[in-house]
A protein has these predicted regions:
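Eukaryotic intrinsically disordered, low-complexity regulatory regions
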Residues: 171-174
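Short beta-strands within extracellular/lumenal beta-sheet-rich domains
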Residues: 3-31, 99-107, 135-136, 188-189
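Polar/charged alpha-helical tracts
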Residues: 25-26, 73, 77-78, 109-110
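A short acidic (Asp/Glu
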Residues: 16-17, 46-49, 129-133
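Extracellular beta-strand-rich recognition modules
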Residues: 29-43, 47-53, 114-124
Length: 189
């Protein structure tokens, strides 16, 4: 047998026991937060870097890497990604650790009730100079209710699927990825 206790305080009310979603009108603010930092080299010499968002992206097949990668690239060529972080807003110097990362915060109210996709674009330079390693960390959504109650959701609860566009390059940092390089990540973010 299982016994579930509903204390009656915000977030633990019996009347909401079967609720799966919250009506957007019941959310006062919703902010997407994350941080970016670079290690090594000179990040200002990086060819291209952006963070994009879209509520029009059709989604990934997740079993056909070629089709998925072409879809992501075509979406960029067609200009359908909305830029969250333009190249000019990225950190311009490498730092020693995540505590010195540049924080970013974006209002998500316009995306309530919609499926979204986020793309991180990083195109490095040739190997004649040290390549900066980019860290995209601490991604979360913070919701505030009219009562002042706050709820934080980490990236692990978003249901995102990573797509590793450089999986066939056999990069040094991917050697530990013995399976699913197409849809895997180097770290467990």
């Amino acid at each position: 047998d299982f016994l579930t206790f509903f204390s009656g305080e915000a977030g633990s009310k019996y009347e909401y026991r079967e609720r799966e979603t919250i009506d957007p009108s019941q959310i006062k603010s919703s902010m997407l937060n994350f941080s970016i930092w670079f290690q090594y080299g000179n990040p200002s010499t990086t060819l291209e870097k952006h963070v994009y968002i879209s509520d029009e992206f059709t989604g990934l097949y997740k079993d056909n890497f070629e089709a998925d990668s072409l879809l992501v690239e075509q979406f960029e060529k067609d200009g359908k990604w909305k830029e969250l972080v333009p190249q000019s807003a990225f950190p311009t110097a490498a730092v020693g650790n995540a505590d010195l990362a540049t924080p970013y915060s974006f209002d998500m109210k316009e995306y309530m009730g919609k499926r979204i996709a986020i793309a991180i674009c990083y195109r490095g330079i040739d190997n004649t100079v040290a390549q900066s390693k980019m860290y995209f960390e601490r991604m979360r959504i913070n919701n505030v209710m009219p009562s002042g109650q706050e709820a934080e959701y980490s990236a692990g609860s978003f249901g995102f699927t990573p797509i590793n566009m450089k999986n066939k390059w056999n990069l040094k940092d991917q050697t530990s990825m013995t399976k699913d390089r197409e849809y895997g990540t180097v770290t467990n973010n």
